[in-house]
């Protein structure tokens, strides 16, 4: 197969090139300085410059529906929106890494290099329409992430989290590749665009193709924490340094759902009632399991981890809607809008958690928030905004995210699925209100860590303001997302 690479291909992948070049700056400077770290703020600045450049290039070249590298990558509305959301989440997480005791030190340049390399993999994953390119992006993102988690100084929990994530991630990748092999055997190719128009028919006529699609979907179910493939999530989220957890919960989750969306958008669900029903029940079970487990947690990070599982269930409602809708843009835009809201509120929640960690091994329990409202009223208000938005309370952005997604499901006749989503959202209110009650109603001496946390504080405040202000203009934002997908 001949692949002709022209100037247009290079321009389309320029966001990835910008990220890659920016990732080299910190480690190059370290080598030139005789293996001595430059000031961490300079390293962070170099990374953020690369992210800003990549976002600008995505705005300029993304959304054009052009393909590159023999139709292996596409730069459409999904690529543009999901890429920007993921890069914004990655950038915010890097700001948290700059001030966190478990991630700063003699290896900060290497850590930023790995984070930027993972971000390059994210952009490949979010734009890939060839299953082999999806795999390349997935592995580039994941392998860098495994090393990032394991690099957390000498904390044993991080080493354990990295090992669990690596073993289970490798298993999921094997399942995904197994599915790709089946699809290649039944269609003679691995490009999603080549079988998108007749995927529903292939599911009915080719058992091999059905198996392939099923295995690919199962591989993604692990990556996005769909029950029963969610068990790794609380352990890894709790064991990883908090900035890394924020990185995984926002940027990694966003691009994984983007790739998952491209598979579901082939309309293969309409060709198999069994696969359609199984995914619906998996979405419901994921919501129930995530919320039920979150209620029983006292560890703040573990509670957010289980709530992340529940949110994956909500997002599955949007994916399924996009998979059966004649106007896939409506369901897909609901997923993108929800991921935008989810990214803001999750980064914010983990930013507050990071500020409460007094040391590398400190565990933040919900009861530790007692008195936080008196000690730090502004940060307590920010955390309240994040938790209310996660619960879906109006007029926060989280409420409108659920509204648009469930409304799309009802419009496609998936009323029962939307009802399950709304019921579980009500259940979630209980454990999201618990930290708020502890902060404002209980006496205590909750205080943030002694080291400088100015950048993390700014991150939390900006996220809280964005959640509130964007909630008032959610309609135009949703319309802009939907228009870019048409």
UniProtKB/Swiss-Prot annotation:
Reaction catalysed by this enzyme: a quinone + NADH + 5 H(+)(in) = a quinol + NAD(+) + 4 H(+)(out)
Keyword terms, alphabetized: Cell inner membrane, Cell membrane, Membrane, NAD, Quinone, Translocase, Transmembrane, Transmembrane helix, Transport, Ubiquinone
Principal localisation: membrane
EC number: 7.1.1.-
Transmembrane regions: 5-25, 41-61, 77-97, 118-138, 165-185, 209-229, 245-265, 275-295, 304-324, 335-355, 380-400, 413-433, 458-478
Compartments (UniProt record): Cell inner membrane
One Gene Ontology CC term in the entry: plasma membrane
Biological processes, Gene Ontology terms: ATP synthesis coupled electron transport
Record has Transmembrane helix as a keyword: yes
Bilayer topology: Multi-pass membrane protein
InterPro entries per the UniProt record, alphabetical: NADH-Q_OxRdtase_suN/2, ND/Mrp_TM
Any GO MF annotation of the entry: quinone binding
The family this protein is said to belong to: Belongs to the complex I subunit 2 family.
UniProt function note: NDH-1 shuttles electrons from NADH, via FMN and iron-sulfur (Fe-S) centers, to quinones in the respiratory chain. The immediate electron acceptor for the enzyme in this species is believed to be ubiquinone. Couples the redox reaction to proton translocation (for every two electrons transferred, four hydrogen ions are translocated across the cytoplasmic membrane), and thus conserves the redox energy in a proton gradient.
Assembly notes: NDH-1 is composed of 14 different subunits. Subunits NuoA, H, J, K, L, M, N constitute the membrane sector of the complex.
Name under which the protein is recorded: NADH-quinone oxidoreductase subunit N
Gene: nuoN
């Amino acid at each position: 197969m001949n692949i002709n690479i022209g100037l247009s291909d290079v321009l389309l992948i320029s966001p990835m090139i910008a990220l890659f070049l920016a990732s080299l700056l910190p480690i190059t400077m370290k080598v030139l300085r005789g293996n001595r770290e430059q000031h961490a703020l300079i390293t962070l600045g170099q990374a953020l410059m690369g992210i800003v450049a990549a976002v600008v290039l995505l705005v300029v070249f993304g959304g054009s529906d052009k393909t590159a590298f023999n139709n292996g990558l596409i730069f459409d509305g999904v690529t543009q929106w999901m890429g920007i959301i993921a890069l914004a989440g990655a950038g915010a997480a890097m700001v948290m890494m700059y001030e966190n005791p478990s991630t700063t030190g003699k290896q900060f340049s290497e850590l930023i290099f790995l984070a930027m390399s993972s971000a390059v993999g994210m952009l490949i994953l979010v734009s890939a329409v060839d299953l082999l390119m999806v795999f390349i992006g997935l592995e580039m993102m994941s392998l860098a992430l495994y090393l990032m988690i394991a690099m957390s100084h000498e904390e044993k929990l991080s080493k354990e989290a990295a090992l669990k994530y690596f073993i289970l991630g490798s298993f999921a990748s094997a399942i995904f590749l197994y599915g790709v092999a089946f699809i290649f055997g039944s269609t003679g190719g691995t490009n999603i665009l080549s079988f998108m128009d007749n995927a529903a028919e292939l599911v009915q006529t080719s058992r091999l193709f059905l198996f392939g699609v099923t295995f690919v979907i199962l591989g993604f179910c692990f990556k996005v924490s769909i029950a029963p493939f969610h068990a790794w999530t609380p352990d890894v989220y709790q064991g990883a340094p908090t900035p890394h957890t924020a990185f995984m919960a926002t940027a990694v989750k966003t691009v994984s759902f983007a790739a998952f969306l491209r598979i579901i958008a082939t309309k293969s669900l309409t060709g198999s009632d069994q696969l359609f029903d199984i995914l619906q029940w998996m979405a419901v079970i994921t919501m129930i399991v995530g919320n039920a487990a979150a209620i029983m947690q006292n560890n703040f990070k573990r509670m957010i981890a289980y709530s992340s599982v529940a949110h994956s269930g909500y997002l599955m409602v949007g994916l399924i809607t996009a998979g059966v809708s004649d106007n896939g843009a409506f369901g897909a835009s609901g997923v993108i809008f929800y991921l935008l809201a989810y990214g803001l509120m999750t980064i914010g929640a983990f930013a507050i958690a990071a500020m409460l960690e007094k040391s590398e091994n400190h565990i933040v329990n919900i009861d530790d928030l007692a008195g936080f409202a008196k000690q730090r009223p502004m940060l307590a208000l920010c955390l309240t905004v994040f938790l209310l938005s996660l619960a879906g309370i109006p007029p926060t952005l989280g409420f409108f995210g659920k509204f648009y997604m469930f409304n799309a499901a009802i419009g496609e006749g998936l009323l029962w699925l939307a009802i399950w989503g709304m019921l579980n959202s009500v259940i979630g209110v209980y454990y999201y209100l618990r930290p708020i009650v502890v902060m404002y109603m209980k006496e205590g001496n909750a205080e943030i860590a002694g080291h400088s946390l100015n950048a993390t504080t700014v991150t939390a405040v900006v996220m809280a303001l964005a959640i509130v202000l964007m909630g008032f203009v959610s309609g135009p934002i949703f319309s802009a997302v939907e228009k870019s997908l048409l």
